[in-house]
Amino acid sequence: MQIIGRKNEIEELETLYNSRKPEFVAIYGRRRVGKTYLVKELFKDRFTFWHTGLSPYDRERRYLMRDQLQTFYYSLQDYGLTGETCPKSWLEAFRLLEKLLKQKDEGKRMLVFIDELPWMDTARSRFIPAFEHFWNGWAAKHDNIMLIVCGSATTWMTDNLINNKGGLYNRLTSEIQLNPFTLSECEDYFRYQDIVMSRYEMVQAYMTFGGIPHYLNLFDKRLSLPQNIDALLFNRNAKLQNEFDRLFGSLFKNEEDYMKVVRCLAKRRSGYTREEILEATKIKDGGGASDILRALTASKFITPYLPFGQPKRIHYRLCDHFCLFYLHFLDKAEKPEEHFWQNNYMSGKLNAWRGYAFEEVCLSHIPQIKAALGISGINTKESSWIVRDANGKPLSQMDLIIERADNNVNLCEIKFYGSLFEIDKRYDATLRDRMQILINKLSPKQTVKLTTITTFGLKRNEYSGQVQSSLTLDNLF
């Protein structure tokens, strides 16, 4: 099958494969983002050894090390190891891998791929010292070895490989963080799969599933977008109905605390400070809380940001599109309503949600917005701002503020609308008030440029003149 997007990653991996020295590559990113698919489709029949760690989800932890060693032994046998018994330790297991690779060594590049490496590091298994010894003591001494490891547990990958302070310090020759598809890559994917969909619908698909290839791969091209959403999320035996629990259960130990934080952040689009999160979730302050926030950030479920005008008040907001959708529509439903999306497609509830979700899509495509504004080469800082009164009541909301190094500031109004967006007299007054509030907060040398980001553009009338730039959903592709 064709690999959609990933051009930079493909070029880097091919360059590393063709080098004449040992290479140690770590690929990490959110679960379901396509790490394994990329390696499998790129290298196809060039693997010397391939092993996938055993998922700990729904397994008894006391047997995990035994089971991990057993499956590793089976992989060794699949690739030709004979005359050996199942190893009882990871030192012994990697010694058997060395033996297998020596048998296969013909002087050509030998590609070793270990998928879901973090799952193999079970409690008290001493996996890391054995893995360090395999690389430092043997693999790194062979110029024809290329070792690729993958993992969805991003913090494990960063702590134990990328930022390792022990035996693997500075041993990686390359690290690749694989991100979800952009809208443009989703469009390429749908076209490749012969799925006919307008960009208007593609944006709504992105609101629901994000750019996660695995979810998009489940689409049935015979169905409309509402039918696909129902089939995957709301109908009986929907394939993704339990995905939220499975996702966190496979990524994190003690996943309940991680899910508490995510559920907390789903309640307010602007997010919360660390202190507010701990108070709402009852998670104790300390290293554990920091680890949770760091892990969720590294896995791209949440993002830290500084709200406009609050340079020392870091907030965290939920940014994973699938989680946002799931927690809004499915989390509290004892039994999801069959055909919910089709039955409510034009309802006020769904239209209101689309407005919020479109803002998140725009925040996921800042580089595309900057390119459309012609400011890709200018340093910028992006934020949002909810203006509140003395009692904390919201007075005004600014969806996206782009502060530029050239002393211009784009105040972006984001609207998801079924036709051309029209500014009437009342909304014109609202926009002027927002601009004045922002101007009062900025330096006198800064210029505010009102910018709209809408689905199909701005209707020209007597009130549209103050808009300096008008972008549409096409600019996000």
Where are these regions (language model features)?
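A cross-kingdom feature that marks ATP-driven nucleic-acid transaction machinery
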Residues: 308, 314-477
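Phosphate-binding site recognition
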Residues: 1-348, 450
